[in-house]
């Protein structure tokens, strides 16, 4: 029960602060969103590059001899 009360109190104070300092919040978001997009883009690029990489020479993609094909 105390966690519910604390959560509601924190939510109320957060909403009050959001409305009181709205322009500061938008200023922060204007700076944080491009940085977050760059970071997420780099992570997506790294994941894509890893999935496209060619296996080293001498190793086949399907090394199971029981696969017909």
From Swiss-Prot:
Query: Which residues lie toward the Cytoplasmic compartment?
Result: 1-2, 53-69
Where does the record say this protein resides?
Answer: Magnetosome membrane
Membrane side Lumenal: which residues? 24-31
Q: What is its main location?
A: membrane
Transmembrane parts of this sequence: 3-23, 32-52
Which GO MF terms are attached to this record? Answer: metal ion binding
Q: What is this entry's stated membrane topology?
A: Multi-pass membrane protein
GO CC annotations on file: magnetosome membrane
Which keywords does the record carry?
Biomineralization, Iron, Magnetosome, Membrane, Metal-binding, Transmembrane, Transmembrane helix
What is the induction comment?
A: Part of the probable 17 gene mamAB operon.
Q: Which domain of life is it from?
A: Bacteria
**Null-mutant phenotype, please?**
No magnetic response, fewer, smaller magnetosomes which do not contain magnetite. MamC localizes at mid cell in a short chain. Magnetosome vesicles are approximately wild-type in size, shape and chain-like alignment, but there are many fewer vesicles, only a few have crystals. Deletion of approximately 80 kb of DNA, including this operon, leads to cells that are non-magnetic, lack internal membrane systems, grow poorly, have reduced mobility and take-up and accumulate iron poorly.
Identify the stretch annotated as signal peptide in this record. Answer: none
Any extra detail in the entry? This bacteria makes up to 60 cubo-octahedral magnetosomes of about 45 nm in diameter which contain membrane-bound crystals of magnetite (Fe(3)O(4)).
**What is the recorded function of this protein according to its Swiss-Prot or TrEMBL entry?**
May be involved in an early stage of magnetosome nucleation. Not essential for formation of magnetosome membrane vesicles, it is probably functionally redundant with other proteins. May bind magnetite. One of 7 genes (mamLQBIEMO) able to induce magnetosome membrane biogenesis; coexpression of mamLQRBIEMO in a deletion of the 17 gene mamAB operon restores magnetosome vesicle formation but not magnetite biosynthesis.
- Protein family membership: Belongs to the magnetosome MamI protein family.
User: What name has this protein been given in UniProt?
Assistant: Magnetosome protein MamI
Q: Which organism is it from?
A: Magnetospirillum gryphiswaldense (strain DSM 6361 / JCM 21280 / NBRC 15271 / MSR-1)
């Amino acid at each position: 029960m105390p966690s519910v009360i604390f959560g509601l109190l924190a939510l109320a104070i957060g909403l009050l602060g959001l409305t009181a300092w709205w322009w500061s919040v938008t200023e922060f978001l204007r700076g944080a969103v491009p940085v977050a997009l760059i970071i997420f883009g780099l992570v997506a690029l790294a994941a894509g590059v890893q999935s496209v990489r060619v296996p080293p020479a001498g190793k086949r993609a399907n090394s199971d001899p029981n696969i017909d094909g």
